[in-house]
Structure formats: structure tokens, C-alpha cells
Curated annotation (Swiss-Prot):
Part of the 30S ribosomal subunit. The lineage of its organism: Bacteria, Pseudomonadati, Campylobacterota, Epsilonproteobacteria, Campylobacterales. PROSITE patterns: RIBOSOMAL_S10. This is Small ribosomal subunit protein uS10. The keyword Ribonucleoprotein applies. One of its GO terms (molecular function) is tRNA binding. Signal peptide: none annotated. It holds the Pfam family Ribosomal_S10. It comes from the Bacteria. Keywords: Ribonucleoprotein, Ribosomal protein. GO terms for biological process: translation. It comes from Helicobacter hepaticus (strain ATCC 51449 / 3B1).
Length: 103
């Protein structure tokens, strides 16, 4: 039995929350203990570009990208838990990072 940490990232928080819910449901079906999901601070990236390619430096446009993060800890992962996580079909825009941590 080992501890697994899942770190999920997405631009859309609704898609991220649906993916987190499906992961939590799959882990609970196998009987493993779970901690989370823990929402981490949203990172905001702002970009400012000139509207005109030639003149009018005062005329600018601002864009923002928000990256939402969640962490899920699976405290006692069994082989069934790992199999159920591998079979999950998550949204393609959700980035999942898996870290294995021994006790």
C-alpha cells in the first residue's frame, strides 16, 4: 500500500471539478481512503499587447489566462485503485500529474 498524489490543472474550473468528481467516485468504489480535493490558488497570467501594429501606443488590449489547480491524496492505494484510475476517461483539457509517495 502506498500513497498517491494527483495534481490536476485546467483552464476551466467546471471541467476540472467534473474530472475531480469522477476520480473521487472511482477511488471510493475501490474502498481506498482519500484526502481532498484541495483547491490551490488560481494562477493568473496577464498579457498586454498593442492593438495597432504601427502607431497608437496608448491603445492596448489585455488578456488573462487563469489556471485552476486541485490536489487529491489517495492514502492507501491498492492495485484495484490504480487500475480504476487508469481506466478513467477524463477530459482532454485536464492535465493530471501523478506522484507516488511511500510512507
Amino acid at each position: 500500500m502506498e500513497r498517491i498524489r494527483l495534481r490536476l490543472k485546467a483552464y476551466d474550473h467546471r471541467v476540472l471539478d467534473r474530472s475531480v468528481a469522477s476520480i473521487v467516485e472511482a477511488v471510493k468504489r475501490t474502498g481506498s481512503e482519500i484526502r481532498g480535493p484541495v483547491p490551490l490558488p488560481t494562477k493568473k497570467k496577464r498579457y498586454t499587447v498593442l492593438r495597432s501594429p504601427h502607431i497608437n501606443k496608448d491603445s492596448r488590449e489585455q488578456f488573462e489566462i487563469r489556471v485552476h489547480h486541485r490536489i487529491i491524496d489517495i492514502m492507501s492505494a491498492t492495485p484495484d485503485t490504480v487500475d480504476s484510475l487508469m481506466k478513467l476517461d477524463l477530459a482532454p483539457e485536464v492535465d493530471v500529474e501523478v506522484m507516488s509517495m511511500s510512507k
